[in-house]
Amino acid sequence: SFKNKYSFYRNKGKENYSMSGENTPNYNWDQLDEKVTIEAKEKANNNDYQIDNTYYDKYIREKYDQLKNSSKNTKYDDSKEYEDLDILLSIVKDLNIKMKFAIIPANGKWSDYTGIDSATRQVAYNKIKEIAQNNNIEVMDYSNKEYEEYYMFDAMHLGWRGWIDFERDLYKLKK
C-alpha cells in the first residue's frame, strides 16, 4: 500500500533525498531485507501463507475452508488481457519508449491452496514474457519468487521482501 511505501522511505532516515531520482541513496539492501523480514514476521503470523494478518482476517479467515480449491478451474492460456497487453506494449515499442516490465509472482502457497497449481501459473508468466520479448521490452521477472518467505503481502501484491527486491532493481536502473 501507499502507506507502507511512504513509511519505508520516511523511516529509513532518507527524507532529504529528492523523489525525482536525481540522488539515489546507497541503501544496504541486505540490511533492509533483514529489517523488513523481522517486521513481516510480526505482521503475518496468524496464517500459514505469510499473508498480512489484517488482510487475512478481513478477507480470508471466515471463508478459509470454502476457498480450498475454489479456483481449480482457472486457466491462464487464453485471456483477452494478453491481447490488451500486446497492444499496449506494441505502442510502447512503436513510440520508441524505453521501459522495463515487471512480472510479479502470485503467492505460491496460497495459490496452491486455492487450486491454481504452479504449472497453471507458469503459463501466465511465460505468456507475459513472450509478449514483452516480442515487443523488445526488457522484463524484470520475479515469478521464481512465489514461495519466498514474506515476498507477497497477500495473494497477488508485493509484500515486505518483494518491495525490497523491486526497489533495488529500480535503483539499479538509475545508478
Positions of the model-derived regions?
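Active-site segments of SGNH/GDSL-like serine hydrolases
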Residues: 91-116
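Long, positively charged, glycine-interspersed low-complexity recognition regions
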Residues: 111-175
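A structural motif corresponding to the C-terminal end of an alpha-helix
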Residues: 86-100, 130-138
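Secreted/periplasmic serine-hydrolase-like ester/acetyl group-modifying domain
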Residues: 1-91
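Functionally constrained cores in energy, signaling, and assembly domains
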Residues: 84, 92, 99-102, 167, ...
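Generic detector of short, locally flexible boundary/turn motifs and exposed helical patches
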Residues: 63-68, 103-106, 129
